[in-house]
Amino acid sequence: MLKEVRPAVVSLLALTMITGLAYPLAVTGLATVLFPYQAQGSLVERGGKVVGSALIGQEFKGDEYFHGRPSATVAPDPADSSKTVSAPYNAANSGGSNLGPTSKALADRLSEDVAKLKAENPAAAIPVDLVTTSGSGLDPDISPEGALFQVPRVAKARGVPEEQIRKLVGASINQPLGGVLGEPRVNVLKLNLALDAAAPR
């Protein structure tokens, strides 16, 4: 009996050591050496202080900043732990809203967001990413069209010409990887930091 079981036990222990310890440590070590910025969470600093991650969306309030996509993240309801409440940009609980196309709550939120954006820039078509949430609820990027839509509001709030802000948006566009993978996008955190540097409030 022991003769038959021994190979299985040895294999289990060997594979546990290889896949559970050696491989993760090797990959973590290589990542830290080859890609230190990414391995540490793609943290973005300003003045030596971490202000966010380039991979996680965060909320920017006020007309003087570019705003990201709506967030669908939630948190436990303090009054009833079996329920959740809206908690935008809650990085501890990433996930979509799971609201379907027939959901009244989704329709109401979309109507409210569209009305707010139409009031902000009545002449322009509203880019879809400014009213839809991402699968994670924490998308750090918006489309170039989403950023350009917000230029008049930001320029007015900062008291600078729109053309200056448009150039800043143009310089902040990340192109698809290799020209084919992904879509052109603008990282909202990095754009707002560049905005603060170029046109202080």
Curated annotation (Swiss-Prot):
Localisation: Cell inner membrane
GO function terms (MF aspect): ATP binding; P-type potassium transmembrane transporter activity
Classification via InterPro entries: KdpC
Compositionally biased residues, Polar residues: 81-101
UniProtKB keywords: ATP-binding, Cell inner membrane, Cell membrane, Ion transport, Membrane, Nucleotide-binding, Potassium, Potassium transport, Transmembrane, Transmembrane helix, Transport
Domain of life: Bacteria
Gene Ontology cellular-component annotations: plasma membrane
Keyword ATP-binding: yes
Membrane topology: Single-pass membrane protein
Transmembrane segments: 12-34
Start and end residues of each stretch annotated as Disordered: 73-102
Main location class: membrane
Family classification: Belongs to the KdpC family.
Primary role: Part of the high-affinity ATP-driven potassium transport (or Kdp) system, which catalyzes the hydrolysis of ATP coupled with the electrogenic transport of potassium into the cytoplasm. This subunit acts as a catalytic chaperone that increases the ATP-binding affinity of the ATP-hydrolyzing subunit KdpB by the formation of a transient KdpB/KdpC/ATP ternary complex.
Subunit details: The system is composed of three essential subunits: KdpA, KdpB and KdpC.
Protein name, entry field: Potassium-transporting ATPase KdpC subunit
Protein source organism: Rhodopseudomonas palustris (strain ATCC BAA-98 / CGA009)
Gene name of this polypeptide: kdpC
